[in-house]
Swiss-Prot record:
Its EC number is 3.6.4.13. It is found in: Nucleus, Nucleolus. PANTHER family: ATP-DEPENDENT RNA HELICASE DBP3. The gene is fal1. This is ATP-dependent RNA helicase fal1. ATP binds at A69, Q70, S71, G72, T73, G74, K75, T76. It comes from Aspergillus niger (strain ATCC MYA-4892 / CBS 513.88 / FGSC A1513). Belongs to the DEAD box helicase family. DDX48/FAL1 subfamily. Its main location: nucleus. A motif (DEAD box) lies at residues 174-177. Coiled coil: none annotated. It comes from the Eukaryota.
Length: 399
């Protein structure tokens, strides 16, 4: 478990892959640079995960690639290792660009690339909104081999000509279903238009609905596909329950009762709107519960410090919108509560994947009003899973 991947679940995964995809059982079989191999082993990996053993070689060959597997299976390292293999660190120009839907995820990817590339003298910059634009300009003018960023700030830096694109050979879209959603789609096309015509495109996500896959035809050429079968997508090791609360106004008392019953290492509570996050945070504090909260309208400095406190365990309960559901890795989270069921069924798996990271036990509890029953059934059907009513002994499951 040093590498943080649940190997038992990983070995059982079934893939729908393109016929040319072969499995590389070890990192040595991938013919990676010696300095990169050192970084991989120092990072804690001993052997590749299922998705890594299939996708890395294809990406390193220069093929456009679509890789889909659930949270905690090593997707970030899949494209990070591939990027580090194909860049030339002697050339101090941007050669790979990774786009993510949230600032926190872009920063996390930067730290993974820096750690894996520890012996390669790699320069990687997180180019994200809400931060000092002067720092971006200084770093980009100095020259960065890899840029990990959010679409808006990256597009801005390209337009201002501080992010030079002529040497870029790979574009990675992480959490691609979110990036190709209405909110980001135009910004992604904006960035894509500035890239050299031969740029390789890698699309990565835990969920890839058919309409998103269809959209990739606009900017991918004959992509290799490494896709986990959908009925394997709900996460092993996470027990999923619902509590029937009937009315919206009963949710708060239910949450307080739960809080009194459970010993929580760390928990994330998801609400659907920023307003609800603020309201619930105030209500919990009035009731003398210690909680922190985060949503997309907060200044970046505040978001960073809340994330740091939560990672270090200084705060135990975080109330958030879906800004936190995507790819953020905090290993101690044992409980996720969907105070509101997600309006988008793809987000369900991203949310519950925050608990039980990397094969640890986790519990997901869904608050379900009488209006929500249909949404819950839709989630069960979509993921071929069963969500049972919460048992009385839920505290034992978290201990």
């Amino acid at each position: 478990m040093a590498d943080g991947i649940d190997r038992r679940a990983d070995d059982r995964m079934e893939f729908n892959t393109s016929k040319e995809v072969t499995v590389a059982p070890t990192f040595e079989d991938m013919h990676l640079k010696e300095s990169l191999l050192r970084g991989i082993y120092a990072y804690g990996y001993e052997s590749p995960s299922a998705v890594q053993s299939r996708a890395i070689v294809q990406i390193c060959k220069g093929r456009d690639t679509i890789a889909q597997a659930q949270s905690g299976t090593g997707k970030t390292a899949t494209f990070s290792i591939s990027i580090l293999q194909v860049i030339d660190t002697v050339v101090r120009e941007s050669q790979a660009l990774v786009l993510s839907p949230t600032r926190e995820l872009a920063t996390q990817i930067q730290s993974v690339i820096m750690a894996l590339g520890d012996y390669m003298n790699v320069q990687c910059h997180a180019c994200i909104g809400g931060t000092n634009i002067g720092e971006d300009i200084r770093k980009l003018d100095y020259g960065q081999h890899v840029v990990s960023g959010t679409p808006g700030r990256v597009a801005d830096m390209i337009r201002r000509r501080h992010l030079r694109t002529r040497h870029i050979k790979m574009l990675v879209l992480d959490e691609a279903d979110e990036l190709l959603n209405r909110g980001f789609r135009e910004q992604i096309y904006d960035v894509y238009r500035y890239l050299p015509p031969a740029t390789q495109v890698v699309v990565v996500s835990a969920t890839l609905p058919y309409d998103v896959l269809d959209m990739t035809t606009k900017f991918m050429t004959d992509p290799v596909r490494v896709l986990v079968k959908r009925d394997e997508l709900t996460l092993e090791g996470i027990k999923q329950y619902f509590i029937a609360v009937e009315k919206e106004e009963w949710k708060f008392d239910t949450l307080c009762d739960l809080y009194d019953t459970l010993t929580i290492t760390q928990a994330v509570i998801f609400c659907n709107t920023r307003r609800k996050v603020d309201w619930l945070t105030d209500k919990m504090r009035e009731a003398n519960f210690t909680v922190s909260s985060m949503h997309g309208e907060m200044p970046q400095k505040e978001r960073d410090s809340i994330m740091q406190d939560f990672r270090q365990g200084n705060s135990r309960v975080l109330i958030s919108t879906d800004v936190w559901a995507r790819g953020i890795d905090v290993q101690q989270v044992s409980l996720v509560i969907n105070y509101d069921l997600p309006t988008n069924r793809e987000n369900y798996i991203h949310r519950i994947g925050r608990s039980g990271r990397f094969g640890r036990k986790g519990v997901a509890i869904n608050f379900v009003t009488s209006d929500d029953v249909r949404i819950l059934r839709d989630i069960e059907l979509y993921y071929s899973t069963q969500i049972d009513e919460m048992p009385m002994n839920v505290a034992d499951l978290l201990s």
